[in-house]
């Protein structure tokens, strides 16, 4: 099952409301037929900030691979813009999809690309070099967990658990790293045995598959599901089965707790 592409299907409303005494924006009010008993969370950017800054690694790396194949009328600036646009467009899907797109762009320009998995491995090595100190600091306690979490993450997880809600995590990051980083952040205490990530065979995993598994194994319909995410995939997938979608328009860089305007518009469009 392939992952859906981004397609804005909902307009951004001119007016919304805010839940009293919170910064939670209510974009589309709805009546609750039942209290959700299954909560699905995206990982990076929704709960974890360990990989904050990943785009600053990916865009230059992919640009470097595509530049040698630029057409005569394509300036370096135009290639950078192209790469940034498709990386942004595919954010929320598994990393391999951005590498597949790179290979397609090289092929369109008459080049012979490497295997997308090779590009992914190169990117991942560069990213791990950037975040290694964060992971080590979390492991030895020199970096507090709170500094690598989206503000309020553990409070939300604890509140859901107290209300009898089963918690799941699904990420486009490779599963072994999601498991390890969830442990470093203390998230595994809330979702043990229910943390999923990308597989070597990318076609064998998607967030839609995780949602269908939750519904099937628990014999419930989509109304029993609530999903939290800063990516369009989990928002659109949750809405497609009738669940409640909570967009997390997180400011990853400053960790300010304020809304990221670009994420907000994109997530509202997704549902």
Language model features with spans:
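A metal-dependent, Asp-based hydrolase signature
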Residues: 84-146, 151-162
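Conserved Lys-Pro-Asp/Glu-containing loop-to-beta segment of HAD-superfamily phosphomonoesterases
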Residues: 205-238
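Short, acidic/turn-prone active-site loops that include or flank metal/cofactor-
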Residues: 195-202, 249-255
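Active-site neighborhood of HAD-like aspartate-dependent phosphohydrolases
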Residues: 6-81
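Structural recognition of alpha->loop->beta junctions
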Residues: 185-199, 258-271
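Surface-exposed amphipathic alpha-helices with a cationic face
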Residues: 154-162, 215-216, 235-246
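Acidic, Mg2+-coordinating phosphoryl-transfer loop and its flanking beta/alpha structural elements
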Residues: 171, 227-271
